[in-house]
Structures are given as structure tokens and as C-alpha cells.
Amino acid sequence: RELNSARQLLLWLWGPLQLGLEGALPLQQSSPFNEPSGTSIQLKQRNGAAVWDAIHQRLERAVTGGLSNATGQMLAIEGLHPERRRELLLALLRQLNAVLQRLRLDQQASAEKRSDRALSEHWQALQPELRKQALCTMAGHYVRLPMGEELSGVADHLILNTELEDIDEELPNPKRMLAPFLDDQPVLVDGQLLPADDPRALLQLETLVSNWLVRTAELIGSELLGVCGDWPELRRYLLDQRLISTRELERLRNQLNTQSRWQAWIQRPIRLY
């Protein structure tokens, strides 16, 4: 009863915006990355490992070549210095590659770890360390900046003052994203089960990995914006030039918090109902 009441309230408030336009065209679904012109994809072999290698290379080229925000939403990583943002995304890709290799070896060594539940639990357990390693790589293991009268290690400071174990419920399902790479499982695309090396399946897997990459970078980026306020030198090193001012940094954080609440309280319930 309560859920139905909430649904009716949301439709009454927002229904005219969503349902009341005759002949309206649906908005195009945006990808965090601009798609390169054409979809020329070459695979060394027709298996999950080769598909992952192709996706890995495509995303590395996209990140290295520079990204533009096509999500229609404000992103925390846009507040980072362009070089730090690029280093963070590349570090996450490298960590994902290392995790896939580890999962593949673990599954070969133990049949028990091949179940969907074991895969999901193992994947979730590896996320905090994956984020920590990517953060350290982005910050620079040996970079030290003035803090008062002393030099302080940037990576150590960030690890001590960030929370990297938060759970994002919008992250892709581990089985859907990982199983085709690990076990050569087929991919469900528009009601069809396709092999992972089919171009349609490959592009869907690339979208899932892109989603994971950007959302994980967002978790880290939000934490970074929160720890830079009291350390001017860290702001100059990590953040975009426009956010060196504490006032501008706080304004961006407030805007991101407002956007997050809007998505959690309004947009997500509407999608669920």
C-alpha cells in the first residue's frame, strides 16, 4: 500500500514531465565515453580473454585521447586536474586487468570459486584494495608536498583520509560484466544469447566496463574533493585550476551532493516503479 501510494505521488508530481508530451522522442542513451568513429574491432582469438584485451585497448585509447562528459550530469572527476583524471582512469583499467587475471587463476585452481555467488563475493572483496592501488598510482607513490613546515606524502595522506569501501548499488552486476571474460559465457543482447566475440556483445560488455570505470572513478573523485579543503598545495596538485579557491570547491561539492540526493530520492524511485 505504501509503495503504491509513493508511486502515485511520484507520477502525480513528475508524470506530466515524463508522460504528457505527445509525439515526444526518447532521449538518446548517453555513454560516458564518446564512441570512436566506426566500430572496427580486431580480435586475436575468439575467446573471452581476447575480447577483454580488445575492450581494454579501446578504453585505454579513449582515456589517453581525452574524454568529454556525455552523461548529461555533473561528475566529481571533472573537478580533478586533467592529468590526474587521466591517470586515475588508466590506473583503474590496469587494476581491473590485474583483478581479471587473478580471478582467472583462482577459478582454474578451485572449482568452488566458479559459482556465480563465489565470483560476486570475491569481486566485492577485491574492490577496496583495487581502489586503493589506483588511488596511490594516481597520486604518485613518492610525491611529497609541503604541509606546514614539513613535507608529507600525498598517497599516504589520501589513503588515511578517504573512505574507499562505499558500495554503489548502480555498479554493473559482476556476473554480467566478468563471466564472459572469465568463462567465455554468452552475452544476452536484446533477447538473444550471443558469443562474447560478436560485435553487439562486445560493445555491450564495453558499455558495462565503461560504466564500472566511471562510477568507480566517481567514488574516488568524490573522496578526493572532500580531503583537499585544508591543504592548498594538494588542491593545486590534484584539482582543476578553477577549484583552487576553497569557495569554488565547496560550491562544487554542494552541487554534487544536491545532484546525488535528487538521483537517490527522485530519479531512482521513478525508474524502479
How should each PLM-predicted stretch be described?
Residues R1-N69:
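Polyanion-binding and phosphate-handling cores
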Residues M74, E83-Q95, V99, D106:
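Eukaryotic N-terminal intrinsically disordered, low-complexity segments enriched in Ser/Pro
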Residues G79-P82, R86-L89, K113-D116:
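Alpha-solenoid helical-repeat scaffolds
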Residues L92, V99-Y273:
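Long, charged low-complexity terminal regions
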